[in-house]
């Protein structure tokens, strides 16, 4: 049995609707090239919480908390063709989405 080539694409953003929209767009592009695709697989959402003092010198009990969540999706492409890779390279993602590609 021959080894299968695999591409993993991780999308990360602070806006879950943006991640979902672009994950579906990547899937549509890959489906046009007849490659096998798994996903989008939702990865755990990470919540970031920052606590700061409200005043600069006194009132240690008076604090304020800021939080934001980062949402991630994983897309796996099995046996990509050169056409698949070309179409993925031509795709322009918005600035709010971070893309990590591993093969």
UniProtKB/Swiss-Prot annotation:
GO biological process: translation
GO MF term list: structural constituent of ribosome; tRNA binding
Swiss-Prot/TrEMBL keywords: Ribonucleoprotein, Ribosomal protein
Cited PROSITE patterns: RIBOSOMAL_S10
Listed Pfam families: Ribosomal_S10 (PF00338)
Any Gene Ontology CC annotation: ribosome
UniProt cross-references to InterPro entries, sorted A to Z: Ribosomal_uS10, Ribosomal_uS10_CS, Ribosomal_uS10_dom, Ribosomal_uS10_dom_sf
UniProt KW Protease keyword: no
The keyword Metal-binding belongs to this UniProt entry's keyword annotation: no
Origin: domain of life: Bacteria
Entry similarity comment: Belongs to the universal ribosomal protein uS10 family.
Primary role: Involved in the binding of tRNA to the ribosomes.
Oligomeric and partner information: Part of the 30S ribosomal subunit.
HAMAP family (alphabetical): Ribosomal_uS10
Protein name in UniProt: Small ribosomal subunit protein uS10
């Amino acid at each position: 049995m021959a080894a299968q080539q695999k591409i993993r694409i991780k999308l990360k953003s602070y806006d879950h609707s943006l991640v979902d929209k672009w994950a579906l767009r990547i899937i549509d592009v890959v489906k046009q090239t007849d490659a096998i695709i798994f996903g989008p697989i939702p990865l755990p959402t990470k919540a970031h919480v920052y606590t700061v003092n409200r005043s600069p010198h006194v009132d240690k009990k008076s604090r304020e908390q800021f939080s934001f969540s980062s949402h991630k999706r994983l897309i796996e492409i099995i046996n990509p063709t050169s056409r698949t890779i070309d179409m993925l390279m031509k795709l322009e993602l918005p600035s709010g989405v971070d893309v990590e590609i591993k093969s």
